[in-house]
Structures are given as C-alpha cells and as structure tokens.
C-alpha cells in the first residue's frame, strides 16, 4: 500500500513544477509588450504581488523591468510606490517577528497568516473586474488562469494529505478564483473583438498615356483682385 508521505511528496513535486509554470505563464504577455513597445491596458498588479514569493524573484524582476521600460510615467510612479511599500512592509515584518515573537510557533503563525493573505491576493489579481467592465478577455490571458487553477488544485491536495491550514486556505481560494476567471473567459470570449490586420489601401492612379497634354491654371502677378487667371498647356512625352 502506498504511504501518505509518498503521495504527499509526489504531489509536492508536481506542485513545484506547476508553480514554475505559473510564474512562466505571463511570458506571452511580456513578449507582446516588447513587440508593441507599449504595456497597453495590462496591469502590473499581479507581478507586484507575486514578487513576495522567493522562488519567483528573478522571473518577476524580469517582468517588472520589461513593464517599467514600456510604461508611461503614471505606471512607473505606481510601480515605484508599490515596490517601496512592499520593501518597507517586509522589513517591518521581519523586524517585528524577530523582536516581538520569541517562539517558533508564534513566528510561524504570524508569517503564515501573511502568506494566506498575499497568496489569496495573488490568485485574485488577474483583472477579473476589468473583464466584466470591458466585456473583453483580451487582457486576461487564458494560460494564466488555467495554470493558476492547476497550481491551486495541486497545492490544495498537497495540504489536505497532511493538513496545513496556511497552504490550504490560499490555494483553495485560488482554485475558486481560477474557476471564476475561466467562467468569465467562456462568457466574454465571443464578445472580445478579434484583431485584424489593417492593410493600408493606397489610391490607384490611372496611367498617363503617351504624349498627354495637361491644362493647368497659372497665376499672373500683374493681375489685380478679381481678375481671371490665365492657363498654360503642358505637354508630357513618355519615352519607352
């Protein structure tokens, strides 16, 4: 009979793989930003939230750099404020936990509660409200929602095998949020305008026949106001 510990280890390994996929799922978004050299209506909120996750720091730093380079001044200012707030908050938490909580159990409880809060925000951040307002899923990528669902489901199962409330709550809520996003995607997918190539149509010009004469008006400097402009005939000869 397979032991619960073995099952938990296998699920944990799968969860790590899916989590890595979750952090890589925004790659198509940032390829699009680089290609268009504009962040369009994408938001930095999901990226700013998940930078708190240690294993994704390098990947998220790359995303933030790309977003910063192609953002306007308003978005750059917002990112700076949020990142500075995160850094100050994490420093305050570290100092507070080390100095105020003197037992491992108490420290784990405080940090665990914070992980529940920020983990829940991470799952709920991909622009659900914007989809409802615009009735378009253009800026809520399907890949991110699918991987979020798989990631939350896997880690929920992992936490239930040997119950861990700090893993169960954010990931269980993550599954619900991902299902909501997938339902919204199914509802608004058909109403999302499809991108079409805008080919510029240049006006066609009729060919000029050989030995064509063109009559054009010519202004006369000696004429006074109200006088009639004279005309000149221009002969055009096209050599073969």
Swiss-Prot record:
GO terms for cellular component: membrane; plasma membrane. The chain crosses the membrane at residues 10-30, 47-67, 79-99, 109-129, 141-161, 165-185. Belongs to the SWEET sugar transporter family. It is found in: Cell membrane. Signal peptide: none annotated. It is a multi-pass membrane protein. Pfam families: MtN3_slv. Mediates both low-affinity uptake and efflux of sugar across the plasma membrane. The keyword Repeat applies. Its main location: membrane. Keywords: Cell membrane, Glycoprotein, Membrane, Repeat, Sugar transport, Transmembrane, Transmembrane helix, Transport. This is Bidirectional sugar transporter SWEET7c. GO terms for molecular function: sugar transmembrane transporter activity. One of its GO terms (biological process) is carbohydrate transport. InterPro entries: MFS_trans_sf, SWEET, SWEET_rpt. Residues 1-9, 68-78, 130-140, 186-240 are extracellular. Residues 10-48, 110-191 form the MtN3/slv domain. Glycans are attached at residues 225, 235. Residues 31-46, 100-108, 162-164 are cytoplasmic.
